[in-house]
A protein has these predicted regions:
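Blade-terminus and WD-like Trp-Asp/Gly-His loop motifs, strongest in beta-propeller folds
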Residues: 1, 45-52, 134-141, 183-189, ...
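A flexible loop/linker signature enriched in serine peptidases of the S9 family
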Residues: 4-22, 38-42, 57-110, 125-131, ...
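Short loop/turn segments that connect beta-strands within beta-propeller blades
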Residues: 27-31, 115-119, 163-167, 212-214, ...
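A short, compositionally biased micro-patch
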Residues: 28-29, 39, 137, 254
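Alpha-helix capping at helix-to-loop junctions
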Residues: 29-33, 59-62
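A structural signal for short, well-ordered beta-strand segments and their strand-loop junctions
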Residues: 47, 54-56, 123
Length: 266
């Protein structure tokens, strides 16, 4: 299953400012790709959760939601008004621009769940919440790090858990005093890299924590980097800096002049 842009009908919709993403299937033994389905959002990533797909979508609050409007005068009027105002931008948030992303004012990354049996697709994260990282645990659980703001973005992040089968959204770590990098479930317990940023400030290295019943506990007072910071503007590849199985986290660390792979056993 992959994302592509080959359907003329949807190409026309996207030319008219509608957000659609088309998905195709390709037999691993050969043959042509076949159109599978389309969702009325701008999806950029997908992860499988049982018989459903967890989609990372780009959502623009500046635009009218044309993809969900019925064809008619209301939709035509909304499109006309949007096109007439495209020669200027209103900045009413901080930050309104980001390096490598361009204008980010009123733009968020959100999560949607697509049901491959019914064909329904629904955004499952709150309005104006920006999802910064997400992980699918098993067939039914999504962990994600987010920042909720409507005027000025906070330096702190929260950790949430969404249960696909029930639609329940639970806040595990409040967005009030931590920076969070990576989260997973190890041996049945939510475990994450994070920092209170009290010793060295914003770029302070992470420590390893667990959270249960709203209580955050230090698991390891680790003080080295949990990322590969040995790089330059010209490099061959990039990818995730941490992965996990049921028992351990495997991550890249920077030690002086070299990067190494380390593990944590929860």
């Amino acid at each position: 299953l992959f994302i592509a842009d080959r359907e003329k009908a949807y190409q026309e919709k996207m030319k008219n400012e509608e957000d659609w993403t088309c998905f195709y299937t390709l037999n691993i033994h050969g043959g042509e790709a076949q159109f599978a389905f389309a969702v009325p959002y701008k999806a950029v990533k997908m992860k499988k959760a049982g018989k459903k797909l967890v989609l990372t979508v780009k959502y623009d609050y500046n635009k009218p939601d044309l993809s969900h409007m019925e064809e008619g005068e209301e939709k035509k009027a909304a499109l006309k008004a949007w096109k007439e105002e495209k020669d200027y931008e209103v900045f009413d948030e901080l930050p309104f621009w980001a390096n490598g992303q361009g204008i980010v004012n009123k733009k968020r990354t959100r999560l949607a769940v697509y049901d491959m049996e019914s064909g329904s697709c629904e955004i499952v994260t709150p309005d104006y919440e920006n999802v910064e990282s997400s992980w699918v645990e098993g067939d039914d659980t999504i962990l994600y790090v987010s920042s909720l703001y409507t005027d000025k973005k906070d330096v702190y992040q929260g950790l949430k858990q969404y249960t696909v089968s029930t639609g329940e959204l639970e806040t595990l770590v409040e967005q009030k005093d931590m920076s969070i990098d990576y989260a997973c479930i190890l041996k049945g317990k939510v475990t994450f890299f994070g920092s209170y940023m009290k010793e060295y400030g914003f770029n302070e290295n992470d420590k390893l924590y667990t959270v249960e019943d709203g209580k955050v506990e230090l698991l390891s007072d680790y003080d080295d980097s949990v990322h590969n910071s040995i790089c330059c503007d010209c490099k061959f590849a990039d990818g995730v800096s941490a992965v996990h199985d049921e028992d351990k986290i495997y991550f890249i660390a920077t030690l002086r002049k070299q990067s190494v792979i380390r593990t944590f056993d929860a």
